[in-house]
From Swiss-Prot:
InterPro entries: UVR_dom, UVR_dom_sf, YacH. SUPFAM superfamilies: C-terminal UvrC-binding domain of UvrB (SSF46600). This is Protein-arginine kinase activator protein. Activates the phosphorylation activity of the protein-arginine kinase McsB. Is required for the delocalization of competence proteins from the cell poles.
Length: 185
């Protein structure tokens, strides 16, 4: 996508503005964003890069850093990725891994970061197409309720757990009935 201001460089900033109830999308390059920083709400003296974002996440705050000393000490035991040779310290510096094996090698180090960034989720769920995903929505809901049930039992909230268990049973019954209907067709 090309910058809407200069029509020369690739757009790296994408804004959505709502003006008088009308949604307007603006796509501009970094240079035009700096030049027109006031109109886009960007501070001209404060640069932004993905590196700064990831560095900020890796060095979140003092409580995270204190917890991170134990977390990062494990990465020093694993000196480098066996495939590409990248160390976790290098990842912290440049903000990106060298290969897919790095994710496996440094999994225990990046899990807290991912959990913080993705609101507690560390597993990609993806989207389900509406046309063909009817049963998948129900199965996902059952999986979420089962996790909630385990949590409630662990917290000894047995009355709430019984309600969740009943919801799971109802959803499983509806799933069985839709599966049997599809088999008959």
């Amino acid at each position: 996508m090309i910058c809407q201001e200069c029509h020369e460089r690739p757009a790296t900033f994408h804004f959505t503005k709502v003006v008088n109830g009308e949604k307007i999308e603006v796509h501009i390059c970094e240079q035009c964003a700096k030049e027109n920083s006031d109109s886009y709400g960007i501070s001209a003296n404060q640069g932004f890069s993905i590196h700064n974002l990831l560095s900020g996440l890796l060095n979140m705050d003092s409580s995270f850093q204190n917890a991170g000393t134990q977390m990062f000490s494990h990465s020093e035991q694993i000196s480098a990725c066996p495939k590409c040779g990248m160390t976790f310290q290098q990842f912290r510096k440049i903000g990106r891994f060298g290969c897919s094996e790095c994710y496996k090698t440094f999994h225990s180090n990046i899990t807290p970061i991912l959990r913080k960034v993705h609101s507690g989720n560390t597993v990609h769920a993806g989207k389900i197409p509406k046309r063909i995903g009817g049963n998948l929505h129900v199965r996902r809901q059952i999986d979420m309720l089962k996790k909630e049930l385990e949590s409630l039992i662990h917290q000894e909230e047995f009355e709430n757990a019984a309600h969740v268990r009943d919801q799971i049973r109802l959803l499983e019954q509806s799933l069985k009935s839709t599966d049997s209907e599809e088999e008959q067709e």
